[in-house]
Amino acid sequence: MMKRNILAVVIPALLAAGAANAAEIYNKDGNKLDLYGKVDGLHYFSKDKGNDGDQTYVRFGFKGETQITDQLTGYGQWEYNVQSNHAESQGTEGTKTRLGFAGLKFADYGSFDYGRNYGVLYDVEGWTDMLPEFGGDTYTYSDNFMTGRTNGVATYRNNNFFGLVDGLNFALQYQGKNQNDGRDVKKQNGDGWGISSTYDIGEGVSFGAAYASSNRTDDQKLRSNERGDKADAWTVGAKYDANNVYLAAMYAETRNMTPFGGGNFTNTCAATENCGGFASKTQNFEVTAQYQFDFGLRPEVSYLQSKGKNLNVPGVGSDQDLVKYVSVGTTYYFNKNMSTYVDYKINLLDDNDFTKATGIATDDIVGVGLVYQF
């Protein structure tokens, strides 16, 4: 019974923090440095050869802070991912820096940081991105404007509205242009800004909304189906997190922002090619329901869909589903550091002319993992 009670307290905190129990490396004279990470022994089972096989990875990072004055604190974070499913001869293939930023926190006046960080749209998207393995992929991609992890973002955050309203948080974000390092057109962005706000009204209930708008680069306008000057997105969401129950839902729309399909981003790709582009508009919906048993089991069922509008792929129609699946999974926590999970992605996309033309996968995937985290 004691173990069950401990797990009931530890696991929700683990899920909220993203790390089970960061190892404190140094804590002296107002300076603190923590190490966190995980090793995920992960395997996919699928008829799709591109998604079948070993997916093991290692992820670790540092969080540090320094007390400058009683009102001013400096902080920084760095996170790195190492793929462990490649031959040694392939070297560092798949390794990447996920996060890297530094900032200052000014007591109740908020915090400001700059670097590689999450875009403010993820403040709401993160509520539904809680599946054991899959999820968070209707419109959120790394280095896709301010939808996920991205470069060159200056972020101001304020919690509890200057200390005046408990649970009312907001963020303002600016992103500089990213196109000068030879990156793929799908990963480029012009100057942009975003705003988000979340409100925890108590009893486990929270609401949130976010908006972002960016200039598109010349390459994005010339080498894709959509040639609009701006890329925009907005999202709203809600969650309930109490009494061992977790429920969350999100709706979002994007314009000239969400990439789909393969690498041939041209406005003349034929239906027989692995073509793709930016969707003129997408409508995105995600919902997840989970329950945490005291003995460590956490079952989950979720539904995710992204519908693209005015896709301009010749011969296949202008409106198509880009993402559509049901996730059924469960995680079992042995303790705060060790867990195992299985996640079954039931792909509801049809194998049709559109998915063949764009190379979008339509097969189911089962992910099975064993995780050590600290």
Swiss-Prot record:
InterPro entries assigned: Gram-neg_bact_OMP (IPR050298), Gram_neg_porin_domain (IPR033900), Porin_dom_sf (IPR023614), Porin_gammaproteobac (IPR001897), Porin_Gram-ve (IPR001702), Porin_Gram-ve_CS (IPR013793)
Residues in the Periplasmic compartment per record: 28, 69-70, 108-110, 159-166, 202-203, 243, 294-295, 335-336
Compartments, record wording: Cell outer membrane
Transmembrane segments: 22-27, 29-44, 56-68, 71-83, 98-107, 111-116, 152-158, 167-178, 191-201, 204-216, 231-242, 244-255, 281-293, 296-309, 323-334, 337-346, 365-374
An annotated GO cellular component: pore complex
GO BP, sorted A to Z: monoatomic ion transmembrane transport
Bilayer topology: Multi-pass membrane protein
The keyword Membrane appears for this protein: yes
GO molecular function terms listed in the Swiss-Prot or TrEMBL record: porin activity
Record's keyword terms, sorted: Cell outer membrane, Ion transport, Membrane, Porin, Signal, Transmembrane, Transmembrane beta strand, Transport
PROSITE patterns: GRAM_NEG_PORIN (PS00576)
Transmembrane recorded as keyword: yes
Extracellular-facing ranges: 45-55, 84-97, 117-151, 179-190, 217-230, 256-280, 310-322, 347-364
Signal peptide range in chain numbering: 1-21
Family the entry assigns: Belongs to the Gram-negative porin family.
Function text: Forms pores that allow passive diffusion of small molecules across the outer membrane.
Subunit structure: Homotrimer.
Name by which UniProt lists this protein: Outer membrane protein F
Species of provenance: Serratia marcescens
Gene responsible for this protein: ompF
